[in-house]
Amino acid sequence: MMKKIDVKILDPRIGKDFPLPTYATPGSAGLDLRACLDSAVELAPGETQLLPTGLAIHIADTDLAAVILPRSGLGHKHGVVLGNLVGLIDSDYQGQLMVSVWNRGQKSFTIEPGERIAQMVFVPVVQAEFNLVEEFDSSERGAGGFGHSGRH
């Protein structure tokens, strides 16, 4: 299913020097987001930085949201992940998409202008209304928490 999302280009290099986000393959769930930097940024071990993407989106549809996720290669090969682990973009947000990057690795890592730093996935949203109860109907699991359902 393809859904149209309004996007505003905030950095004139997007569409010229840096491509617009696209799906890499027909089966891709995420669109790559790029660092819209004027110069390279060095991330020391343990350091976080907030990087602009040069894009703003307005999802508008309250049945959708977007999540910003790490790119697997950056995390696995270089220890660079998202500083907030997952970014949530609500349907009514209209500001620039920013990416918090965190170097959890042991070596400094340099992020170049236009480098792919995260991916964005659109997800369905269900808003819940709470129904206050004194007790729950019993279930097989009950209140068993972490590790309760077994190891295998």
From Swiss-Prot:
CDD domains referenced in this protein's UniProt entry, alphabetically: trimeric_dUTPase
Cofactor: Mg(2+)
GO biological process: dUMP biosynthetic process; dUTP catabolic process
Catalysed transformations (reactions): dUTP + H2O = dUMP + diphosphate + H(+)
Enzyme class: hydrolase
Pfam families, sorted: dUTPase
Gene3D superfamilies, alphabetized: 2.70.40.10
InterPro entries registered for this protein in UniProt: dUTPase (IPR008181), dUTPase-like (IPR029054), dUTPase-like_sf (IPR036157), dUTPase_trimeric (IPR033704)
GO molecular function: dUTP diphosphatase activity; magnesium ion binding
EC number from the UniProt entry: 3.6.1.23
UniProt KW keywords: Hydrolase, Magnesium, Metal-binding, Nucleotide metabolism
Binding site for substrate: 71-73, 84, 88-90, 98
Pathway where it operates: Pyrimidine metabolism; dUMP biosynthesis; dUMP from dCTP (dUTP route): step 2/2
Superkingdom, taxonomy of origin: Bacteria
Similarity section: Belongs to the dUTPase family.
Role description: This enzyme is involved in nucleotide metabolism: it produces dUMP, the immediate precursor of thymidine nucleotides and it decreases the intracellular concentration of dUTP so that uracil cannot be incorporated into DNA.
Stated name of the protein: Deoxyuridine 5'-triphosphate nucleotidohydrolase
Native species: Serratia proteamaculans (strain 568)
Gene (name only): dut
